[in-house]
């Protein structure tokens, strides 16, 4: 099964490809040789693999213990094999059994607060992390995880239909996400590795690639960074508003 960013279908050139080999029972030894050969093949063709091997029961136990694992399973999908195995896992980790809505919401809010706290310094502002900084991709994903867990939302447009987002706000969210995706893709390509920080050494190259030209008023690099700051400010404000609305909705729920 595909998990994480691979499960969401959000890969960039040097993203890890996160997979799990899902077994019906805890009988890894029976398949150990086949599993090793399969993983060796993936490494031999130079894929950056993040992998785990778990049974249905182990998934339920690990997800109940660790919200990161629970989150990765929420957005998982079957790649090959018996799809009923993943369907069983999803039943085992549904919100009535582990990480009930309020618990999940509070845990994800706490994660976000701690993440923001690490990226509020001047250095992080000048060379921001596209994923982890406030208003970054992780904040967008957090909204997706919470809305999927509580409302069963399949995408952000569901939030428009549920009147959490205005159509214009939805467009702002998608525009901001696409901008961050574009910059992250460019970072991977020019650094020739997985890179999520918008380092000084890459900013000029990216500005040139994306057509931000110097003029009498400002440099191309300044134009790039101004757009970055505008987009993440908008995304952070949307994130704050949505979390507040979710908080009110979840507090009203009977679960």
Regions found by a protein language model. Name each.
Residues 1-255:
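A nucleotide- and high-energy phosphate-metabolite-utilizing enzyme signature
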């Amino acid at each position: 099964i595909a998990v994480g960013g691979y499960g969401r279908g959000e890969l960039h050139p040097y993203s890890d490809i996160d997979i799990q080999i899902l077994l019906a029972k805890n009988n890894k030894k029976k398949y150990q040789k086949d599993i090793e050969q399969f993983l060796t093949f993936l490494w031999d063709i130079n894929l950056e693999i993040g992998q785990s091997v778990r049974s249905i029961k182990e998934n339920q136990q690990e997800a109940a213990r660790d919200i990161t694992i629970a989150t990765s399973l929420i957005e998982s999908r079957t790649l090959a094999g018996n799809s009923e195995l993943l369907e069983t896992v999803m039943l085992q980790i549904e919100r009535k059994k582990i990480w009930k809505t309020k618990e999940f919401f509070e845990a994800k809010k706490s994660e976000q607060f701690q993440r923001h706290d690490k990226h509020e310094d001047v250095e992080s502002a000048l060379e921001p992390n596209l994923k982890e900084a406030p208003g970054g991709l992780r904040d967008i994903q957090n909204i997706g995880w919470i809305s999927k867990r509580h409302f069963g939302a399949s995408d952000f447009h569901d939030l428009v239909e549920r009147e959490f987002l205005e159509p214009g706000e939805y467009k702002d969210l998608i525009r901001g996400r696409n901008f961050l995706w574009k910059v992250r893709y460019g970072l991977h390509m020019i650094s020739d590795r997985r890179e999520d920080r918008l380092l000084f050494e890459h900013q000029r190259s990216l500005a040139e690639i994306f057509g931000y030209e110097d003029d009498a008023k400002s440099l191309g690099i300044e134009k790039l960074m101004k757009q970055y700051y505008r987009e993440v400010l908008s995304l952070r404000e949307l994130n704050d508003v949505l979390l507040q609305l979710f908080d009110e909705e979840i507090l009203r729920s009977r679960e």
